Amino acid sequence: MKPSEIARVLTENLKLEKYKPCGVCFSDNKPENALEIKKKGNGCVVPMILKASTGVAFVVSEESTGWPCSAFYLGFQDHIFDGIEYFLSNKDDFFRPCEKFIQNPELAKSLINNINPVKPDKKYIVIKPLEDFNESEKPESVLFFVNADQLSALSFLMHYDAPEKFDRIIAPFASSCMATITYPLKMAMNN
């Protein structure tokens, strides 16, 4: 199915009104008028991913990854920062307030050590509306934003042909860029 057809089917059937389904791909070319974070180490990529779903392409390169976490999760560097396991867990004497998302540093370290993000094989990761993909482009993964009712409908639909299956939907711990880019790319590359 062509990307534009995927976009049409998702938009019509899920009644997506506010945000457009987007595709994620790798490219050596930056789309015209694409948004890009100005420099490495400054800013979160997630608001830009949301902006892409309103119709404006967004690119990430090694020079424009935003925060160190994004650089790691998007495959542009092999290390986040020293002490990430404390930042994600419960160590109170870290240099900044901890997020306390994970019970302890050991569990957080285990998570980080097992992420293994997909390494981009081209200069850019491109996130743009599926309807803007040309005939020669193929999305590696698809992302779209939904409300709670739409998410519920998707959950039911995933079990339409096999209601006894319990492994069709996963919700692993993840930052927003991991959930929208890292994990879907890994799943796509493994299929």
Give each language-model segment a name:
Residues 3-191:
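Acidic, serine/proline-rich low-complexity intrinsically disordered regions
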